[in-house]
Amino acid sequence: MASFTFGAGNARKVLRLPLYALGALATLPVRRSPRLWVFGSGIGVGEGALPLYRHARATLPESVRLVWLAGSPAELEIARTLGLDAEMRSGWRGFRLTLRARVLVVTHGFGDVNRFATRGGFVVQLWHGIPLKRLHLDSPATLRVSFLPNHRLVRAAMARAYRFAGQGIGLFPVASALVAPRIVSAFGLPASRV
């Protein structure tokens, strides 16, 4: 299993900035449909996104399409075996579904769906644990870029980028009022969204 580092992850994001810009432009003329929700999880079918998918399917009208966006062919097969409407998140279909969906449910980040088409969607960030450690803006490790020096200007630019991305989160449910301030601080969110 590959290990994740923020330095490498941030480097990939910096290199993909043109794709983020093109994706953001593509979202401008598109009307998002309240009859389309997309779901994804950074570790595959599961986490909080799967129970929410099932609850939404049990309570929303059939006219609302719920789609699991899979990160691999194996995940796609698992999702379909579980009876979920599923597509690959990368590629044109995943981009178009994310682009048109009003609600985007994620557990790790925007990359759980198609990261380039999230602007303008209502992102529900379910996260994937209890924030006992420092996260995102509160952790110096988060603000590093592997191919750039660990300099205050680099960290400031990354912090600004993380704050900007955090503004794309519409709702961040937490387990208790005790952890809410950590999430507000870590993601640069207004308390009203947590």
Placement of each model-derived feature along the sequence:
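Membrane-proximal basic amphipathic "stem/tether" segments
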Residues: 1-36, 145-156, 160, 169
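Active-site and donor-binding regions of nucleotide-sugar-utilizing enzymes
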Residues: 36-194
